[in-house]
């Protein structure tokens, strides 16, 4: 890296540059950077030396910028609607809030085994019980499980709780929040991802778990079903196996079976179902929410 003083001018080819009158070396590079024309293509090196990836691949640098814009937008939206940001414990004596395997550690001074949290849910609920009616946390979770394009042992999640709101209120709220995040991040509500245009501007599609399963799974066999499995779990398996990947545009899936939603409130119109939704975009689950079961 060098510091240059001089006067701007254009070359014979019209390129804007600087006629240097003074330069100072600010720092040396002891190792040569990858070829700027071909970039850094080795995936192992890109993941393990992300700083080099940022130098030579502008699109990766832009992803960091977009992530910062997105998280800032989410925070502004929540705080504009009277949500308070909190931080809950990372080290917990008991883990909960999700079905996942935790990382374990040991506190030497207390001679106590602890777990890195897998979710902030239980502590956020305690804050609601304590009188904070709108709280959220955007922070790290840790799950000692496999690695894939959709799963990482360390990841950031946004979790919020709104006392006295229904899951239908949360659907409307989440739709507006994500639409605003797309605009603040990309300058418009329509974004292109992996060659597909995703439209956050139009109303999100809504269909029930049963409707999705009937649309894409009816008449098709599912392997791995245990004898005596409940109707609700079979419906969920059919949805996950056949329907999930078909949900490309932003879509709320509602009315999940009671058997696969133990902490959600039963629907008053059908006690076999619950007041719950999941949001899907490009075949991936982005959100899971429900009206809490507060009278078991």
Predicted region positions:
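Class II aminoacyl-tRNA synthetase-like tRNA-binding/catalytic domains
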Residues: 1-169, 179, 224, 261
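Alpha-helical structural motif
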Residues: 70, 120, 131-134, 170, ...
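Metal-assisted phosphate- and nucleotidyl-transfer catalytic regions
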Residues: 96-102, 180-284, 291
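TRNA-recognition modules of translation machinery and tRNA-sensing kinases, especially anticodon-binding
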Residues: 116-119, 130, 134-141, 152-157, ...
